[in-house]
């Protein structure tokens, strides 16, 4: 099949593209700066501006079986000023609206059958000890509102006859994943420990399973709507800190107090202090078998492998 990937030059995009290309699928990666993207075997890079339904990529959409939308400003880079928060939202909405408009311009019999749109597990906000599935109500934090609006923009493809899957992703465990590197860095310098009181539930997913769920969404026509991209082994954050310390042979006793995190990070502290006990109900119902279902094995693979 032919698959287009927006944000394809990023960490997840390149991993997904490699997986698809290895199985002889035609992969087209859309990038604002394709000339700077490192070459990737079996992947063709095409320019797009992530704002308008114009350019060669629109022609490539005709006859494609699927499009994966990963485009959007990073939530982990830079302090969350008002300007940055507006950019986080607008970058996602403009890119997604451009995709939907391009689909609308494509003849009905040539449209992709599926749009797989990234979203975040922060959709649910801070949920305490509540068990969260794809049927749970949304939260009201900044990222919850971003996720809701992003998903609403993607759902506009449904009336056009396109199956829409919304991957609500937890923190990705991968050596090239920025958030994971930031999470584990304090432990490497003997300064790791719980964040806040450490009681918040911590959701995560290994990058191989993250890619696997994108493949499931692309290839299984029975999968639609929201899918929690989380591993089954959800833990309290303090347990995750201890496990990271154990794998790295480092102590996990230096806490980052809630007031300090809020003072230093402002609204961004919600990324570390909010939690939700989200489970992969729909992935399991679709028969997905996690390669890394347990926290320890996922950390061992990510932190110790070279």
Language-model features, listed with the residues they occupy:
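Conserved Rossmann-fold NAD(P)-dependent oxidoreductase catalytic core, especially the SDR/UDP-sugar
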Residues: 85, 97-141
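NAD(P)H-binding glycine-rich loop region in Rossmannoid oxidoreductase-like domains
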Residues: 43-95
